[in-house]
Amino acid sequence: MARIIGIDLGTSNTAAAAMEGGRATIIPSAEGSSIGGKAFPSYVAFTKDGQRLVGEPARRQAIANPEGTVTAFKRRMGEDYKFTLRGQEFTPQQLSAFVLQKVKKDAEAFLGEPVEKAVITVPAYFNDNQRQATKDAGRIAGLEVVRLVNEPTAAALAYGIDKAGKEQKIMVFDLGGGTLDVTIMEMGKEGTFDVLSTSGDTKLGGTDMDNAIIEWMVSEFKKSTGIDLSADKQAAQRLKDAAEKAKIELSTTMETDINLPFISAGADGPKHLELKLSRAKLESLVDSIVKRCGASIDQALNDSSLKSTEIDKIILVGGPTRMPIVQKYVEDHAGKKIERGIDPMECVATGAAVQAGILTGDVKDVLLLDVTPLSLGLETLGGVTTRLIERNTTIPVRKTQVFSTASDNQPAVTINVLQGERPMAKDNVPLGKFDLDGIPPAPRGVPQIEVTFDIDANGILNVSAKDLGTNKQQHITITSKTKLSDDEVQKFVKEAEKFADEDKKTKERVDAKNEADSVLFQTEKALKEHGDKVPQEDRLNIDRALGDLKEALKGDDVERIKKAKDDALAASQKLGEIIYKESQAKAQGAAGPQPGAQAQGQPNDGGKEDVVEAEVVDK
């Protein structure tokens, strides 16, 4: 099988690896080691004469060419956003492709053979749009992306590949330049890597720490000179480089000097920035950023149903985890010492190469079971999100459920696909929508629309809808852009907790109305067919109860609606007896759901999903 390389396409740095002699080997950058070690900086630049630079050469000239240089474009993946470099516009996918093209070229020089396929890592909390954008970047670079792997999962593969035969529960704490992922995994004796849960924040990383240092530097310089450097583009790149360098140095020393000569000029001549930054001061600057990591640790543990005492090993991934304050915070918060001896800058690329080896057969007896980070569902009657796939479900996965129409003679249904944890559709991310039309005229609840959600091993979603009566089918691969920013996706789980009471009340109200409306519809339908057989007194009671139910449905009093529904059911008991006796007399006893029957989406004995009545929104 053709060679497949593993790539860690990072916000700040990018690294690649390949299986050589049964072991994963880091592919060196053509320019040699840089600030990221064997990884190279994720920078792209265009010079005045139109030359394109990628990696260390782009970073080195960034100070002199701020308008032609860009980095951290990974934070915009999956968004409708364009960067302007010397008058030219580039999407995040294009810029990422330039980085991947360099990886491809370096790999071919190192391996001495063409490279056309790759496994690329992504943050575990990347949504569907961001994953699609990453695959597109690979295609632009001339690489077939055979698999996307979550970054913490790749790190665990790198850690555990030579520890087969040991059962361990592992927490991977992955704090990179732009994102945080916390993943809980179970490593089995038979070489299985089973992801139990994942949580994270797509807008939290080392870049935020750099910005905190820059703000301090700008503030100190303004105090001493009265000059504000925050709007100076050329100074901005020098400040960024100095902040990153100081942050790295203070991981091993207690104090560092920051010297930026000729950073600006005043009426009395040139100005130089000369500051001392201690580790204690740095830690005070980034303390609030580091503490934001705690919520993701807690969420991952909670979703895995494990206590911190049940975790055997903690693996740290990403450059910022070299900082003593980060290491101490993770140890204190999780209540366990971290695992030493793992290179946080190279282990993700190494794990990607291991996954590539699994696909080619070079690595034997290893099974990776990853999960989807956010729940997936569709909008149903009343603006409710009906989930088909819960978050932290092992992928690949395929789930099917049967729905029906919301009104009589409804010719089409709209499938509005959603991602998130909130019970109401408006609070979740709309991933895409499509129509299934051509439904033959029929009473509501009679048509059976089979909806299937299918997530592949890359975490990319395909949705299909099929009219079981006509076999007409429509499907969509989710590729649409989210209208929300990355940090808003992460907010969903937190919002679900914060607004739990409000969400619960809204969901109860909608459910109560849907159930009551179903009782009203079924009873009125039965009266049309069998009302002449009901004694007059019983008929009056039924009509009165249905009238009360209609009035209750005009308001939002849940208890009143429930009571009116129960009263209507009790009043129509005689009607039910008449229908049952008539059915017995005809000896029909037909199997399967009756038209419009309300179901709860649980599989029946035959493995099919029951019909959920009147749940798909009208077109």
UniProtKB/Swiss-Prot annotation:
Organism for this UniProt entry: Elusimicrobium minutum (strain Pei191)
Family: Belongs to the heat shock protein 70 family.
InterPro entries (alphabetical): ATPase_NBD, Chaperone_DnaK, Heat_shock_70_CS, HSP70_C_sf, HSP70_peptide-bd_sf, Hsp_70_fam
Pfam families: HSP70
Gene3D superfamilies: 1.20.1270.10, 3.30.420.40, Actin, Chain A, domain 4, Substrate Binding Domain Of DNAk, Chain A, domain 1
Region annotation (Disordered) ranges: 584-619
Function: Acts as a chaperone.
Compositional bias (Low complexity): 585-605
Protein name: Chaperone protein DnaK
Lineage: Bacteria, Pseudomonadati, Elusimicrobiota, Elusimicrobia, Elusimicrobiales
